[in-house]
């Protein structure tokens, strides 16, 4: 019967071309990927059979079987899993690209290891590392048996199978190996790869092996006569006499060697989580981790534990060395924990088993108490699941603290998963305080190394009541912030928060060990002595005419203008109210494509324009205003320039950058002694433009010390 031909999705064609032409040496990982897929197919049929046992009647045994066929240069990998319908063969293997296809190709182009392929969900195509043609024979309980075939070109065929033996249920992958990859037909090589990568797969992996055995066979009549003749000719005395009648009755046989084929199970190891942790080597943990995670690296940390009492379950949880490429993608699978009930795999999609902020953790959980016939809906409402989840989170926080005891290990962990910890601080009310101890930041006293909140508290001077922090786009931006001056002068440490998620986390955290967390870009009370307080009150009165004049000039751009005791070197800064967005949060929210604009206008705090009475610029500006120059164009220009500069140094963006640029250009002209009238005269072609308003000589902008 002629098959139907289909075009591969373009990205899949590119991917196969990349793989088939790769010079990557460690090609053995193809077997790991195909066995992993087979194991997934077996998981699915076993789960279906929990609610409908008849599903297993088409093939009662659950297995993965490898059959080398050296004479044909073919390697067959069969599983008795769920199988694929015709539509699934077309969609899953060719016409619908998975989200990881493009991401994997980009990673490869960037120099990533091809053994990462499984993490991107495209492990099937790894077979083209060793084969240049493949047939997939598949039988699902809901459909006929079909053959899917491809030689990694631009198309594939799907044909109703009328030539191969019936497989009952499941899938056979028939790989036609390249001439330089025939080592994967050798028994020794296959066993080596299985031991390295797939020893802990939950289903028996059978290898069809050829063995030489000795058998006793009856001696043919002609050989018997020759034997008798030889006995007669033999003149040597016999050591013992045998009853002649007995000898007559005994059939004459001989031993011959012959080759037989038999199935040998390659993974007889019992489930790792059922064994005592003290009996398991790190190598075994590493091998098990790789078999369940598709990772090619060893894990960073392992947490193996059991909970007994009213509730019983065992778990092995792994913390990877790196974050996956799609860690925070919304469509990504939210859980990497396989749930078993009394050694029977139930699901790896129990999203309620672990909170989203811990979605990077991989492992297995085996419960003694959950019912076997759990549906997804029942999982969500099950009280036992909630208790298991609570225990898992508790044990993982324990593991993170154990990692923190080794600073080098913790640096690796934190660089990969800091965002997850911060997300946990934001979302997990119950464990917020424990997670806060894991947070690390640069600060004014720890610029080059990260410091913990606990260490910050131990360094606090006696008279310091709060924990201070500043938010911003980058370390460089916050290190030079004018907001730091007064706190540095008092020897108060300030934490640098430069990750967008930091501000969300701190907004929820609010305090640490009884100390309030204070954002210094917002309005706050700074600890001051009685002398400082008296001096501040005096300055407020002295500068009242200036603050009023500046407010009149700036109008609705600011809520108020105040004399600041929190600024030293900088002439001015913009601070926001305690309950609105900071400059940094305003920047983050502006970048949100789907933000609520009404919420933005409500949360964008009214700005307070703070001026420093210690700044020579502010002193000179005060002098000008006191002399009656509040309406002076220079004063207005300088005020606007001062305000816009303060916006930038305080982390805001300018609403009208062109006005700011014009003011700067006028300053440049003055600095270069360029008369604006002269400029216009030397550019007659620009005469059609509106004339520039002449500034009276007595109000010219002056250079201020």
Curated annotation (Swiss-Prot):
Coiled coil: none annotated. Residues 219-257, 675-705 are annotated as: Disordered. GO terms for molecular function: ATP binding; ATP hydrolysis activity; ATP-dependent protein folding chaperone; unfolded protein binding. Keywords: ATP-binding, Chaperone, Coiled coil, Cytoplasm, Mitochondrion, Nucleotide-binding, Phosphoprotein, Repeat, Stress response. Its main location: cytoplasm. ATP binds at residues 37, 79, 98, 124, 376. Residues 219-240 have a biased composition (Basic and acidic residues). Sequence repeats lie at residues 221-225, 226-230, 232-236, 246-250. Residues 221-259 are annotated as: 4 X 5 AA repeats of [DE]-[DE]-[DE]-K-K. NCBIfam families: PRK05218.1. The TPR repeat-binding motif mediates interaction with TPR repeat-containing proteins. Interacts with the co-chaperone SGT1. Interacts directly with the substrate CNA2. Interacts with NAP1. This is ATP-dependent molecular chaperone HSC82.
